[in-house]
Amino acid sequence: MRLKDRVAVVTGSGSGIGEATAKRLAAEGAAVVVVDLNQEGANRVADEIRKAGGNADALHANVGNPQELEDMVRFATDKFGRLDILHNNAIRLYTGRVGEMSLEHWRKAVDIGLTSYWYATRCALQVMVGQRKGAIINTGSVSGLAGDYGLGAYNAIKAGVINLTRATAIEYARKGIRCNAVCPGAILTPPILKSRHSQPELARQTEAAIPMGRYGEPIEIANVVLFLASDEASYVNGTFIVADGGLTAHTGIPSVAGSGPDW
């Protein structure tokens, strides 16, 4: 087991990528704190981990509240005696054009998607520095590498996450702490699954734009997080891994050479 005797905290792990990651880390031997705003979701995931033979505790927390992030790290250390892995994954998506989004929604989006990542990292570092070892993995996005119509706040937040990752990595590398990010593309999380049913044409166009011709599965992102959390990534620091089926490898310009994805 790659993570035997290690302790992991995963935010936003009551569903989607966070759920897949919590289960994947637990399957490799980590004791996992399943953190989510949805208590029912957190309880379900923790129960499923335990039924599979793993070690997990559920924790209800609003990551937009700094005190609850402090309590989150304290919960992990009080329960398990240490903290080895932090996966910042929680997000709240607010849509709207840059010139039309309300200040209230902008601030809420930044609080959940960026400020919470910084503050959770800050809290975790207070433990990890003393241990002289730790791995922090942030969920970025391909939307942090380019713009999307109607997702200006999300684009800004995820770009911020990528550079927060880099800053953390260089500042704490000599303390034995690594910090990296995973940047997913279109993944079959609950919101995407819902939109596939309500907007089937958009789903078709999205799949057509992905060179691999399909959406990604949450487990495919969880596998990247597992790698970054493990000793197999011992010299990987301050970078991000894109997992998007080749989406960002393409210029977006239609084929001019008479060949396409099905040639």
How would you describe each model-predicted region?
Residues A181, P200-E232, V236, A243-G245:
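C-terminal helical subdomain
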Residues S141:
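Residue(s) in the substrate-gating loop at a strand-loop-helix junction
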Residues R97-V98, H105-V110, L202, T206:
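Substrate-binding pocket helix/loop in short-chain dehydrogenase/reductase
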Residues Q126, I170-R174, S234:
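Alpha-helical segment proximal to the catalytic Tyr-Lys
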Residues T121, I157, T165:
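Active-site helix of classical SDR
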Residues V7, G14-G16:
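Conserved glycine-rich cofactor-binding loop
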Residues G99, A146-G152, R174-K175, G213, ...:
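Active-site loop immediately N-terminal to the catalytic Tyr-X3-Lys motif
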